[in-house]
Amino acid sequence: MEARAGRACLGGAGAACRLQPWGVGGCRPVVGAHQVGNALLALAAVQALGVDLAEAAPRLNTLKPVPGRMNVIARDRGTLVDDTYNANPGSVRAAIAWLAGRPSPRTLVLGAMGELGPSAETLVTELGANARAAGIDTLITLPGAEAAARGFGDGAEPVEHFDQAAERAAGTLARGGTVLVKGSRSARMEQVVQRLTDKGRGH
């Protein structure tokens, strides 16, 4: 059976769509166009097991975002997105595509990605260029992701420490913008999220 999203609405709080051929609506309270595909796969599996989709689809509303996986954290003025659980070129491109749909200013904070092999520098440079082409306003890179800064060009801010990254990104949040933080688990990019969260609480 072919399953597709007939109408999709991708907002800052989640992804809503009408699912074809079933004609039922569903919403996942997690962000990103790729989440619509994940919802389709889940419902196709449920349908194959004989479960009533009119009952199953609304259950998508109860999904709780996993920390570190496009988890939206509202700040007083801006929006912080914790996508630090892991990273590869494909997931970074998906994150960039979502961030590009947000109002300016938009800042991507990118850490190192592991296991990219001999093409690592080329792949990471291309991600920086991709962020530039998508209209991302600022790219902040941590050690291991410096090649992305070179690919991005003007507006890239390579830094050495988590504190520096958080300090630069805080300006975007103060102006009501969106900051998305991403990197491999080994890059410990959740440290940037924690610092930005603490700043928002006035610590």
Question: Language-model features: where?
Answer:
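Extended acidic/charged loop-beta regions that coordinate divalent cations
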Residues: 1-24, 67
